[in-house]
Protein backbone atom coordinates (compact mmCIF):
# COMPACT_ATOMS: atom_id res chain seq x y z
CA UNK A 1 0.00 0.00 0.00
CA UNK A 2 1.20 3.49 -0.86
CA UNK A 3 1.85 5.81 2.10
CA UNK A 4 1.20 9.49 1.34
CA UNK A 5 2.10 12.55 3.38
CA UNK A 6 -0.84 14.75 4.32
CA UNK A 7 0.41 17.28 1.73
CA UNK A 8 0.53 14.74 -1.10
CA UNK A 9 -2.88 13.37 -0.10
CA UNK A 10 -4.41 16.88 -0.23
CA UNK A 11 -2.86 17.41 -3.68
CA UNK A 12 -4.17 14.02 -4.88
CA UNK A 13 -7.64 15.05 -3.70
CA UNK A 14 -7.43 18.26 -5.76
CA UNK A 15 -6.70 16.16 -8.87
CA UNK A 16 -9.53 13.66 -8.36
CA UNK A 17 -13.27 13.40 -7.95
CA UNK A 18 -14.62 13.14 -4.40
CA UNK A 19 -14.85 9.39 -4.94
CA UNK A 20 -11.12 9.11 -5.64
CA UNK A 21 -11.32 8.72 -9.42
CA UNK A 22 -8.90 10.63 -11.67
CA UNK A 23 -10.75 11.90 -14.74
CA UNK A 24 -8.08 14.22 -16.08
CA UNK A 25 -7.63 15.96 -19.40
CA UNK A 26 -4.18 15.88 -21.02
CA UNK A 27 -3.03 18.66 -23.31
CA UNK A 28 0.68 18.76 -22.55
CA UNK A 29 1.38 17.72 -26.15
CA UNK A 30 3.94 19.91 -27.86
CA UNK A 31 5.55 18.07 -30.77
CA UNK A 32 2.38 16.04 -31.45
CA UNK A 33 0.20 19.16 -31.51
CA UNK A 34 2.59 20.95 -33.86
CA UNK A 35 2.46 17.92 -36.19
CA UNK A 36 -1.36 18.03 -36.19
CA UNK A 37 -1.30 21.69 -37.23
CA UNK A 38 1.41 21.07 -39.85
CA UNK A 39 -0.73 18.27 -41.32
CA UNK A 40 -3.25 21.01 -42.21
CA UNK A 41 -0.54 22.79 -44.24
CA UNK A 42 -0.05 25.53 -41.66
CA UNK A 43 3.23 26.33 -39.92
CA UNK A 44 2.35 26.41 -36.19
CA UNK A 45 3.29 29.47 -34.13
CA UNK A 46 3.89 29.55 -30.39
CA UNK A 47 0.91 31.87 -29.99
CA UNK A 48 -1.34 29.38 -31.82
CA UNK A 49 -0.26 26.50 -29.57
CA UNK A 50 -0.81 28.61 -26.44
CA UNK A 51 -4.23 29.79 -27.60
CA UNK A 52 -5.49 26.33 -28.51
CA UNK A 53 -4.46 24.96 -25.12
CA UNK A 54 -6.12 27.91 -23.41
CA UNK A 55 -9.41 27.32 -25.27
CA UNK A 56 -9.38 23.60 -24.43
CA UNK A 57 -8.69 24.39 -20.78
CA UNK A 58 -11.40 27.03 -20.50
CA UNK A 59 -14.10 25.00 -22.26
CA UNK A 60 -13.39 21.46 -21.02
CA UNK A 61 -11.99 21.68 -17.47
CA UNK A 62 -15.49 22.22 -15.98
CA UNK A 63 -15.98 18.52 -16.89
CA UNK A 64 -12.54 17.20 -15.74
CA UNK A 65 -11.09 16.55 -12.30
CA UNK A 66 -7.73 17.96 -13.46
CA UNK A 67 -5.77 19.13 -16.48
CA UNK A 68 -2.24 18.17 -17.53
CA UNK A 69 -0.30 20.95 -19.23
CA UNK A 70 3.30 21.80 -20.08
CA UNK A 71 5.05 24.92 -18.72
CA UNK A 72 6.38 25.81 -22.19
CA UNK A 73 3.04 26.67 -23.83
CA UNK A 74 0.46 25.79 -21.19
CA UNK A 75 0.72 28.38 -18.41
CA UNK A 76 -1.99 30.70 -19.84
CA UNK A 77 -4.19 27.57 -20.13
CA UNK A 78 -3.45 26.70 -16.49
CA UNK A 79 -4.78 30.10 -15.44
CA UNK A 80 -7.88 29.64 -17.64
CA UNK A 81 -8.89 26.34 -16.02
CA UNK A 82 -12.00 25.82 -13.93
CA UNK A 83 -11.46 26.62 -10.23
CA UNK A 84 -12.40 23.05 -9.25
CA UNK A 85 -9.88 21.41 -11.62
CA UNK A 86 -6.46 20.38 -10.32
CA UNK A 87 -3.24 21.07 -12.24
CA UNK A 88 -0.53 18.64 -13.34
CA UNK A 89 2.54 20.10 -15.03
CA UNK A 90 4.87 18.11 -17.30
CA UNK A 91 8.59 18.19 -16.48
CA UNK A 92 10.05 16.38 -19.51
CA UNK A 93 11.36 17.74 -22.78
CA UNK A 94 9.01 16.73 -25.56
CA UNK A 95 10.06 13.78 -27.76
CA UNK A 96 13.45 12.06 -27.56
CA UNK A 97 16.74 12.14 -29.44
CA UNK A 98 16.27 9.58 -32.22
CA UNK A 99 19.99 9.76 -33.13
CA UNK A 100 21.15 8.08 -29.91
CA UNK A 101 20.05 4.64 -28.75
CA UNK A 102 17.97 4.23 -25.64
CA UNK A 103 15.45 7.10 -25.82
CA UNK A 104 17.08 8.67 -22.78
CA UNK A 105 14.92 11.11 -20.82
CA UNK A 106 15.62 14.80 -20.37
CA UNK A 107 14.19 17.53 -18.15
CA UNK A 108 13.08 20.99 -19.18
CA UNK A 109 16.24 23.01 -18.55
CA UNK A 110 14.39 26.12 -17.29
CA UNK A 111 12.31 24.32 -14.70
CA UNK A 112 12.55 22.54 -11.36
CA UNK A 113 9.85 20.90 -9.23
CA UNK A 114 10.01 23.96 -6.96
CA UNK A 115 9.37 26.31 -9.89
CA UNK A 116 6.52 24.16 -11.23
CA UNK A 117 5.02 24.18 -7.73
CA UNK A 118 5.27 27.99 -7.69
CA UNK A 119 3.24 28.02 -10.94
CA UNK A 120 0.45 26.22 -9.09
CA UNK A 121 1.18 22.56 -9.91
CA UNK A 122 -0.67 20.05 -7.72
CA UNK A 123 1.50 17.25 -9.13
CA UNK A 124 4.47 16.66 -11.41
CA UNK A 125 4.19 14.39 -14.44
CA UNK A 126 7.17 12.89 -16.23
CA UNK A 127 7.18 10.76 -19.38
CA UNK A 128 9.66 7.91 -19.66
CA UNK A 129 10.12 5.64 -22.68
CA UNK A 130 11.14 2.23 -21.38
CA UNK A 131 12.01 -1.16 -22.86
CA UNK A 132 12.41 -3.82 -20.16
CA UNK A 133 14.63 -5.80 -22.55
CA UNK A 134 16.89 -2.86 -23.49
CA UNK A 135 20.64 -2.83 -22.75
CA UNK A 136 20.95 -2.95 -18.91
CA UNK A 137 23.35 0.01 -18.97
CA UNK A 138 20.68 2.18 -20.61
CA UNK A 139 17.99 1.04 -18.18
CA UNK A 140 20.35 1.65 -15.24
CA UNK A 141 20.63 5.30 -16.35
CA UNK A 142 16.83 5.53 -16.48
CA UNK A 143 16.46 3.99 -13.01
CA UNK A 144 18.89 6.49 -11.49
CA UNK A 145 17.17 9.36 -13.30
CA UNK A 146 13.71 8.43 -11.94
CA UNK A 147 15.13 7.96 -8.42
CA UNK A 148 16.36 11.57 -8.56
CA UNK A 149 12.98 12.80 -9.79
CA UNK A 150 11.08 10.93 -7.10
CA UNK A 151 13.29 12.48 -4.44
CA UNK A 152 12.83 15.97 -5.89
CA UNK A 153 9.03 15.60 -5.83
CA UNK A 154 9.15 14.19 -2.29
CA UNK A 155 11.22 17.17 -1.13
CA UNK A 156 8.55 19.58 -2.45
CA UNK A 157 5.76 17.33 -1.13
CA UNK A 158 4.10 17.02 -4.56
CA UNK A 159 2.70 13.79 -6.03
CA UNK A 160 4.86 12.22 -8.73
CA UNK A 161 2.90 10.91 -11.73
CA UNK A 162 5.18 8.75 -13.87
CA UNK A 163 3.99 8.15 -17.43
CA UNK A 164 5.47 4.98 -18.89
CA UNK A 165 5.47 4.32 -22.63
CA UNK A 166 6.81 0.94 -23.71
CA UNK A 167 8.86 0.18 -26.79
CA UNK A 168 11.12 -2.50 -28.22
CA UNK A 169 14.53 -1.41 -29.44
CA UNK A 170 14.34 -4.10 -32.16
CA UNK A 171 10.81 -3.35 -33.46
CA UNK A 172 10.43 -0.03 -35.24
CA UNK A 173 6.63 -0.03 -35.56
CA UNK A 174 4.84 0.01 -32.19
CA UNK A 175 1.48 -0.36 -34.01
CA UNK A 176 2.51 -3.64 -35.68
CA UNK A 177 1.26 -7.16 -34.99
CA UNK A 178 4.84 -8.09 -34.07
CA UNK A 179 4.89 -5.47 -31.31
CA UNK A 180 1.35 -6.30 -30.18
CA UNK A 181 2.56 -9.81 -29.30
CA UNK A 182 5.27 -8.53 -26.91
CA UNK A 183 3.40 -5.50 -25.55
CA UNK A 184 1.79 -7.22 -22.52
CA UNK A 185 5.23 -8.32 -21.30
CA UNK A 186 6.71 -4.85 -21.93
CA UNK A 187 3.92 -2.92 -20.17
CA UNK A 188 3.39 -5.16 -17.16
CA UNK A 189 7.08 -5.74 -16.40
CA UNK A 190 7.91 -2.02 -16.49
CA UNK A 191 5.03 -1.36 -14.10
CA UNK A 192 6.57 -3.85 -11.67
CA UNK A 193 9.92 -2.08 -11.91
CA UNK A 194 8.67 1.44 -11.26
CA UNK A 195 6.39 0.37 -8.42
CA UNK A 196 9.53 -0.26 -6.34
CA UNK A 197 9.78 2.15 -3.38
CA UNK A 198 13.10 3.76 -4.38
CA UNK A 199 11.38 5.62 -7.23
CA UNK A 200 8.87 7.31 -4.89
CA UNK A 201 6.18 7.22 -7.61
CA UNK A 202 2.65 8.04 -6.44
CA UNK A 203 0.64 7.35 -9.61
CA UNK A 204 1.57 5.40 -12.73
CA UNK A 205 0.15 6.68 -16.02
CA UNK A 206 0.30 3.70 -18.34
CA UNK A 207 -0.80 2.14 -21.58
CA UNK A 208 -3.35 -0.63 -21.61
CA UNK A 209 -1.34 -3.89 -21.79
CA UNK A 210 -2.57 -4.95 -25.23
CA UNK A 211 -3.12 -3.36 -28.61
CA UNK A 212 -6.93 -3.49 -28.80
CA UNK A 213 -6.76 -3.47 -32.60
CA UNK A 214 -5.40 -7.03 -32.39
CA UNK A 215 -7.85 -8.42 -29.81
CA UNK A 216 -10.34 -11.02 -31.05
CA UNK A 217 -13.67 -9.25 -31.57
CA UNK A 218 -12.02 -5.83 -31.90
CA UNK A 219 -9.51 -6.67 -34.61
CA UNK A 220 -10.35 -5.71 -38.20
CA UNK A 221 -8.09 -8.50 -39.52
CA UNK A 222 -5.28 -10.43 -37.82
CA UNK A 223 -5.39 -11.09 -34.08
CA UNK A 224 -2.59 -11.30 -31.53
CA UNK A 225 -4.73 -12.40 -28.59
CA UNK A 226 -8.04 -14.08 -27.85
CA UNK A 227 -10.46 -12.13 -25.66
CA UNK A 228 -9.58 -14.40 -22.74
CA UNK A 229 -5.83 -13.82 -23.18
CA UNK A 230 -6.34 -10.06 -23.40
CA UNK A 231 -8.49 -10.08 -20.26
CA UNK A 232 -5.77 -11.99 -18.41
CA UNK A 233 -3.19 -9.36 -19.37
CA UNK A 234 -5.42 -6.63 -17.89
CA UNK A 235 -5.72 -8.64 -14.68
CA UNK A 236 -1.95 -9.26 -14.57
CA UNK A 237 -1.41 -5.52 -15.00
CA UNK A 238 -3.43 -4.76 -11.85
CA UNK A 239 -1.47 -7.41 -9.99
CA UNK A 240 1.84 -5.90 -11.16
CA UNK A 241 1.51 -2.82 -8.92
CA UNK A 242 0.12 -1.72 -5.59
CA UNK A 243 0.21 1.91 -6.72
CA UNK A 244 -2.73 3.89 -8.08
CA UNK A 245 -2.58 3.72 -11.89
CA UNK A 246 -4.43 5.45 -14.69
CA UNK A 247 -4.70 4.81 -18.41
CA UNK A 248 -3.50 7.10 -21.17
CA UNK A 249 -5.52 7.26 -24.37
CA UNK A 250 -2.52 6.91 -26.74
CA UNK A 251 -4.28 8.88 -29.47
CA UNK A 252 -6.94 6.22 -30.20
CA UNK A 253 -10.51 7.19 -31.07
CA UNK A 254 -12.96 8.17 -28.33
CA UNK A 255 -15.11 5.12 -29.11
CA UNK A 256 -12.26 2.60 -28.91
CA UNK A 257 -10.93 4.14 -25.69
CA UNK A 258 -14.33 3.84 -24.02
CA UNK A 259 -14.74 0.24 -25.21
CA UNK A 260 -11.26 -0.49 -23.84
CA UNK A 261 -12.18 0.83 -20.38
CA UNK A 262 -15.28 -1.37 -20.33
CA UNK A 263 -13.19 -4.37 -21.37
CA UNK A 264 -10.64 -3.57 -18.63
CA UNK A 265 -13.34 -3.42 -15.97
CA UNK A 266 -14.85 -6.75 -17.07
CA UNK A 267 -11.38 -8.29 -16.91
CA UNK A 268 -11.01 -7.23 -13.27
CA UNK A 269 -8.68 -4.27 -13.76
CA UNK A 270 -8.41 -1.94 -10.75
CA UNK A 271 -7.35 1.14 -12.73
CA UNK A 272 -8.10 4.44 -11.00
CA UNK A 273 -9.04 6.71 -13.87
CA UNK A 274 -7.57 8.21 -17.01
CA UNK A 275 -5.48 11.01 -18.35
CA UNK A 276 -7.15 11.36 -21.71
CA UNK A 277 -5.68 13.65 -24.33
CA UNK A 278 -6.15 13.50 -28.07
CA UNK A 279 -9.19 11.19 -27.90
CA UNK A 280 -11.06 14.15 -26.39
CA UNK A 281 -9.84 17.22 -28.29
CA UNK A 282 -7.95 16.25 -31.47
CA UNK A 283 -10.88 16.90 -33.84
CA UNK A 284 -10.98 20.48 -32.55
CA UNK A 285 -7.62 21.31 -34.12
CA UNK A 286 -9.01 21.51 -37.68
CA UNK A 287 -11.75 24.11 -36.99
CA UNK A 288 -9.25 26.10 -34.89
CA UNK A 289 -6.65 26.22 -37.66
CA UNK A 290 -9.06 26.67 -40.57
CA UNK A 291 -11.77 28.89 -39.07
CA UNK A 292 -10.33 30.44 -35.90
CA UNK A 293 -11.06 30.68 -32.20
CA UNK A 294 -14.85 31.02 -32.41
CA UNK A 295 -15.15 27.87 -34.54
CA UNK A 296 -12.86 26.00 -32.14
CA UNK A 297 -14.94 27.13 -29.15
CA UNK A 298 -18.12 26.00 -30.91
CA UNK A 299 -16.57 22.57 -31.48
CA UNK A 300 -15.30 22.33 -27.88
CA UNK A 301 -18.68 23.39 -26.44
CA UNK A 302 -20.48 20.69 -28.44
CA UNK A 303 -18.47 17.71 -29.69
CA UNK A 304 -15.58 18.26 -27.26
CA UNK A 305 -17.91 18.47 -24.28
CA UNK A 306 -19.83 15.43 -25.49
CA UNK A 307 -16.56 13.45 -25.78
CA UNK A 308 -15.50 14.26 -22.23
CA UNK A 309 -18.94 13.80 -20.66
CA UNK A 310 -19.52 10.43 -22.33
CA UNK A 311 -16.02 9.38 -21.21
CA UNK A 312 -16.82 10.52 -17.64
CA UNK A 313 -19.86 8.24 -17.63
CA UNK A 314 -17.73 5.28 -18.70
CA UNK A 315 -15.02 6.12 -16.12
CA UNK A 316 -17.64 6.34 -13.35
CA UNK A 317 -18.86 2.86 -14.29
CA UNK A 318 -15.43 1.24 -14.76
CA UNK A 319 -12.68 2.86 -12.65
CA UNK A 320 -11.87 2.03 -9.02
CA UNK A 321 -11.15 4.57 -6.27
CA UNK A 322 -7.48 5.08 -5.40
CA UNK A 323 -8.54 5.72 -1.79
CA UNK A 324 -8.37 1.96 -1.19
CA UNK A 325 -4.72 1.87 -2.35
CA UNK A 326 -3.27 4.54 -0.03
CA UNK A 327 -2.76 5.34 3.60
CA UNK A 328 -1.82 8.75 5.02
CA UNK A 329 1.17 9.39 7.22
CA UNK A 330 0.02 12.21 9.49
CA UNK A 331 3.50 12.64 10.96
From Swiss-Prot:
This enzyme's EC code(s): 4.1.2.40
Entry-linked InterPro entries: Aldolase_TIM, DeoC/FbaB/LacD_aldolase, LacD_aldolase, Tag_1.6-dipho_adolase
Class in the EC hierarchy, top level: lyase
GO MF entry, a single one: 6-deoxy-6-sulfofructose-1-phosphate aldolase activity
Pfam families found in the cross-reference section: DeoC (PF01791)
UniProt keyword list: Lactose metabolism, Lyase
Pathway(s) served: Carbohydrate metabolism; D-tagatose 6-phosphate degradation; D-glyceraldehyde 3-phosphate and glycerone phosphate from D-tagatose 6-phosphate: step 2/2
One biological process term in Gene Ontology: lactose catabolic process via tagatose-6-phosphate
Protein family according to the UniProt entry: Belongs to the aldolase LacD family.
Name of this chain's protein: Tagatose 1,6-diphosphate aldolase 2
Amino acid sequence: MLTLTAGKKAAMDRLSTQEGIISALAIDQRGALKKMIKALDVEPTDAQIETFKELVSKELTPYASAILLDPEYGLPAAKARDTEAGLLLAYEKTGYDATTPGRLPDLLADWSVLRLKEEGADAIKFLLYYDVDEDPEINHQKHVFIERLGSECAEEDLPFYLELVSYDAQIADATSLEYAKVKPHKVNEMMKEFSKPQYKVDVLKVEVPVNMNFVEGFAPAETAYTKEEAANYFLEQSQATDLPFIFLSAGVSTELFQETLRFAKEAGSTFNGVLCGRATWKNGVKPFVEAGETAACDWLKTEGRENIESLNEVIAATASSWHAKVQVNEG
